[in-house]
């Protein structure tokens, strides 16, 4: 195993252990993506700067979940994005929710973590985590942020369709709406 692959896997495993200790058990999905060379280089730079991975919140209020739709896309997801250097995954999720949707959320747990292996034929695999938190609405008016390429923010009482990521199909809907 290449040193970079080993180090990124070990760091991801540490994050899994730390989040399980803080939030309790959650699902882990092992995923594999094939980025182009430029995207891989950006991911590698973020890993080297301790800013690798990302986070989001599946934010609920009463009987609804908050989702965003990005420009040039028709699919929906919870707000979330890339982690910044020195930021915890929870801080990333809360910041991205404010930036993308204009609302505040309170994290209540972890739904799942995606351990994503970025694989190319020219570089060693890089394993990075994306933490998906469960959260409750804490305030603010939903407002799309064009600076983050968010075209629309909306509360859904039924699972939105289409979903940006297949994994969202298993996320809990408030009051049991599946």
Model-derived segments and spans:
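NUDIX/MutT-family hydrolases
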Residues: 144-175
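Active-site-adjacent beta-strand/loop module that shapes the phosphate/pyrophosphate-binding cleft
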Residues: 115-142
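Short, well-ordered beta-strand micro-motif
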Residues: 59, 132-136, 154-157
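A carboxyl-terminal module marker
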Residues: 1-4, 178
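Conserved Nudix-box catalytic region and its N-terminal flanking loop in Nudix hydrolases
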Residues: 60-99
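Acidic, metal-coordinating catalytic segment for phosphate/diphosphate chemistry
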Residues: 6-56
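A short coil-to-beta-strand element that immediately follows conserved catalytic motifs
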Residues: 104-113
């Amino acid at each position: 195993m290449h040193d970079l692959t080993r180090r990124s896997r070990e760091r991801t495993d540490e994050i899994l252990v730390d989040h399980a200790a803080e939030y309790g058990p959650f699902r882990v999905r092992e995923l594999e993506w094939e980025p182009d060379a430029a995207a891989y280089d950006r991911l590698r730079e973020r890993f080297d700067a301790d800013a690798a991975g990302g986070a989001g919140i599946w934010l609920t209020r009463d009987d609804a979940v908050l989702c965003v739709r990005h420009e040039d896309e028709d699919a929906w997801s919870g707000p979330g994005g890339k982690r910044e250097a020195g930021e915890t995954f929870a801080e990333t999720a809360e910041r991205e929710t404010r930036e993308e949707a204009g609302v505040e959320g309170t994290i209540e747990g972890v739904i799942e973590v995606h351990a994503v292996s970025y694989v190319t034929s020219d570089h060693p695999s890089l394993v990075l985590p994306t933490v998906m938190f469960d959260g409750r609405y804490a305030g603010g008016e939903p407002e799309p942020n064009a600076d983050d390429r968010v075209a629309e923010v909306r509360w859904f009482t039924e699972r939105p369709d289409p979903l940006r990521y297949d994994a969202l199909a298993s996320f809990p809907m408030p009051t049991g709406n599946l």
